[in-house]
Amino acid sequence: MTDELKSYEALKAELKKSLQDRREQEDTFDNLQQEIYDKETEYFSHNSNNNHSGHGGAHGSKSHYSGNIIKGFDTFSKSHHSHADSAFNNNDRIFSLSSATYVKQQHGQSQND
C-alpha cells in the first residue's frame, strides 16, 4: 500500500467512527429532549390533578394550592379554582419549546400521523 492509500484508509475509518459518534450523540440528545417533555407533562399533570381532585400529597390530605412556576400562584389563597384557568397547554412548555430541533421533530411527527 502506498502512503496516500494508507492515509486515505485511516481518514475513511476516522470518518466512519465520527459519523457513528454523531448518531449516538443525536440519539442521546433526542432522549434528553423527550425526557424534558415527559417531565414537563408530569409536572403540569401533577399540579392539575392536585388542584382539582381535592386530594393530594403523600398523605392523602386535601390540596388547596393552585398554580405552577409557569403560570404563577395568583390563586393560591382563593378557595374556588377554575379548571380552565389551571389547565395547561403546549404553550406552557417553556423548556421543550426552547429547543428548535425538538419543535421541528414534533411538528414533523404530527404531519406524518
Swiss-Prot record:
What are the entry keywords? Chromatin regulator, Coiled coil, DNA damage, DNA repair, Nucleus, Transcription, Transcription regulation
Kindly report the protein's main subcellular placement as a broad class. nucleus
Among the entry's GO cellular component annotations, what is one?
A: NuA3 histone acetyltransferase complex
Q: Which InterPro entries match?
A: Eaf6 (IPR015418)
* Superkingdom of this protein's organism: Eukaryota
Q: Transcription among the record's keywords?
A: yes
Instruction: Tell me the disulfide pairings in this chain.
Output: none
| Keyword set includes Flavoprotein | no
Q: Which GO terms describe its biological process?
A: chromatin remodeling; DNA repair; DNA-templated transcription
According to the UniProt record, where is the region Disordered?
A: 36-64
Where does it localize? Nucleus
The chain's coiled-coil residues are: 1-43
Miscellaneous comment in the UniProt entry for this protein: Present with 504 molecules/cell in log phase SD medium.
Quaternary structure and interacting proteins, as annotated = Component of the NuA4 histone acetyltransferase complex composed of at least ACT1, ARP4, YAF9, VID21, SWC4, EAF3, EAF5, EAF6, EAF7, EPL1, ESA1, TRA1 and YNG2. Component of the NuA3 histone acetyltransferase (HAT) complex. The NuA3 HAT complex has 2 functionally distinct forms that participate in transcription. The NuA3b HAT complex contains an additional subunit, PDP3.
Primary role: Component of the NuA4 histone acetyltransferase complex which is involved in transcriptional activation of selected genes principally by acetylation of nucleosomal histone H4 and H2A. The NuA4 complex is also involved in DNA repair. Component of the NuA3 histone acetyltransferase complex. The NuA3 HAT complex has 2 functionally distinct forms. NuA3a binds H3K4me3, through the PHD finger of YNG1, and acetylates H3K14 at the promoter region of actively transcribed genes to promote transcription initiation.
Q: Which family does it belong to?
A: Belongs to the EAF6 family.
Q: What is this protein called?
A: Chromatin modification-related protein EAF6
